[in-house]
Amino acid sequence: MTDSAITEYLIKQYLQTSGQEPIYHDMWAQALTGVRKHLLAYTEHSNLTILAERPSGLAGSLFPKMDHLVCFMPGTIALAATGGHTLAHAKAQPTWTADHDAQIELAHELTKTCWGMYKISKTGLSPEIAHFHVANPAVLVASEATPRPSPAELSDDPDAPWRKDFDVHSGDRHNLQRPETVESLFYMWRITGDEKYREWGWEMFEAFEKWTLLEEVERDADGNQIMQYSDDEDEESVRAKAAARVLDTAKTYRGFSSISDVDKIPPPTRDNMESFWLVCHEYPNRLPCEHNVIDYHHD
């Protein structure tokens, strides 16, 4: 499951038409049921929940891989379960069920996995695709009577068990400035009120500013480009310079770039800015707002 083009908009169509087209809710519910039954699995070392693929059909093997595109899913699950209301409001309604609780827990777990795709890299930016280590055969979430416990937080310890679950292939280490994870963080913050989602979103945005913000090219008297970093600089020096330059208001910037390798410091830029990068700016700028500043739900 790599494309949000259909699934994501089923529930949004239902909500944005004030529930007047229930067929879209039914289609969403059917899609989510299939995802929960066939595509959710646990990682081998820390029981992170992943939304995997079955490229050969339901009778084929599970392929433990997540594209960044899939990270729209946790926020959308929470949006659907609560109808766009806060979790406290939704749980107070007589229509709330134990299955809604399970959906919210699933949203939390998938959000954590998507956040792990950022934390696993040296730049703090997600690769386009992450593969995962799972048991053989994979343990499906649907096969367990109760959810398996996963780490409450993804530790910064380089030897933390959760890191062993990630396998980022060399051809998948590029970052195209996609907005799916930060969108889910925004929904999770607005719906649950959990501060960690604001913190994760802001940390993510700071990484984008640090590593993808492009300065105007500086040249010496002979017209040669002055490089921001020298080839023999150590990683800590590069990190310090990157952090300082985003605060330098005297510099002129010319946009943000996709990068070719999230595990290189500094990462090689591609000198192109994707159109959907602008959406990434929308959500971090709303994350600092308290719930009573902007009303997103009109009854």
Where are the predicted features?
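Glycan-recognition and catalytic cores of secretory/periplasmic carbohydrate-active enzymes
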Residues: 1-299
